[in-house]
Amino acid sequence: MIIDKLYENVEKKGCVCVGLDTDISYLPKGFLNKFTNIEDAIFAFNQRIVDSTFDVSACYKVQIAYYEAMGIKGMILYKKTLEYIRKKGGIVIADIKRGDISATAKMYAKAHFEGDFESDFITLNPYMGMDTLEPYKDYFKNKEKGVFLLLRTSNEGSKDIQYLDLKDNKKVYNKVGEKIENIGKEFLGNCRYSSIGAVVGCTAEENNIRKELKHTFFLIPGYGAQGGKAEVAKYYLSGGNGGIVNSSRGILLAYKKYDEEGKNFEECARNEVINMKKTLQII
């Protein structure tokens, strides 16, 4: 199963997931000026980030919104970025956050697990109900695909719904977590984690969430620019390999710490990943 490949990558390369949420404003001006169009510039930037971090990163998360906002040309850029990573043998998480009734979900599955926009994992929103997962299950079993379901996210507004108290002294996200854990047991890899993972932000700590979801691999956003703490992320990593920690702006804009002109932006990105790995290392 695909979760075994991701688990193995974490063992070999560390737990960092590089986020390619690439905005045109992130590109150094000197680099951008070498190109006649925005799409070529961003693709070249993405390539250099991937090449410089490939041996020290577990995987890459590509946020589709940054590409959708550019229209048709942006979606071609999105396709090229996914293909570039996968052809190198890398693992791609398409951050699409879909969630819909089964007939529509079937089309989302086809769109993002096959064809032009094929990826290894996608993010989904389970709050319409677990029946929305049904069209994806064949891909988990037979086509080496996986998902990360939104559980407890890193944004401030997550408290509006996810943190609501229930009658049994649990919160909404605890109940959703129980369902994710139970459904995931059907798709366990050799690593004993499921190809159905969960998105758990490291901007807030919750001790029981890791203990209760023993077979659920975590995608951990919020580190760095969003204020997520390394201590929280480490706990969710479950001894070093129970999840991946995503950073986007912190890596893509690392050059601004050392070299405002960004002449060596890819080297700065690599160093940021290495520093993240050291900070997150379980001692």
From Swiss-Prot:
Belongs to the OMP decarboxylase family. Type 2 subfamily. The keyword Kinase does not apply. Keywords: Decarboxylase, Lyase, Pyrimidine biosynthesis. This is Orotidine 5'-phosphate decarboxylase. Pathway: Pyrimidine metabolism; UMP biosynthesis via de novo pathway; UMP from orotate: step 2/2. The active site is at residue 97. InterPro entries: Aldolase_TIM, OMPdecase_type-2, OMPdeCOase_dom, RibuloseP-bd_barrel. It catalyses: orotidine 5'-phosphate + H(+) = UMP + CO2. Its EC number is 4.1.1.23. Coiled coil: none annotated. One of its GO terms (molecular function) is orotidine-5'-phosphate decarboxylase activity. The keyword Phosphoprotein does not apply. It comes from the Bacteria. One of its GO terms (biological process) is 'de novo' pyrimidine nucleobase biosynthetic process. It comes from Clostridium botulinum (strain Kyoto / Type A2).
